[in-house]
């Protein structure tokens, strides 16, 4: 049976918005949980980098909220986490559950691509399979041959093809050091935060003539999907190209995080919100 770790953390008001847990905060907590699991059951992230010259870069992530959880619901939350190798050593996947007094709450699944590091301060590297010493730290039932496939490309195609586009927007940004990790490249939960900025700017600009957009501030996000192609680095300039659509009874925001070079987005984010059965607007 795959190994799980569980522990409790106190909750503070900075983890919440008025409508529930902050998705970017959940992603940060989830990444920390994956690091705890690796340290306890396999090889910790620091040792992977320093001793095994192996990095782990988040490539795909899915975050689902079962029920909204507010600041006044509980003093703490239980984190449950497990990890596995997938794709014959080409992926490491973690699965994180947030529970406790208000269970069920949220589930995060993140798939990382291993890198063979070059040894420079920027932690540059190329995708490579996990080495034999690293693979040996996992139990047989924690190794799966089938690779993870991101659902985001298919979701994006379906929303664009079958959804009703409500509005579009463009929000510039610059990456600063408080948004980065140790290698002076953005920490992946920043994609969630930047997408939220793009969404809120769409609401600010368009809610007057598209009242449906207000749902994205009045209700919590129910599902996020992320897909990463390349990172942003310190002081990189970029923009969030956002669109809002009504699709299959949900309000869906698609965000392309692009650099000044244009072309393929460096990251994609999809946010899904439930729509009320009765639509009455202020």
Region annotations inferred by a language model:
Residues 65-76, 82-155, 228, 232-237, ...:
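HotDog/MaoC-like acyl-thioester-processing domains
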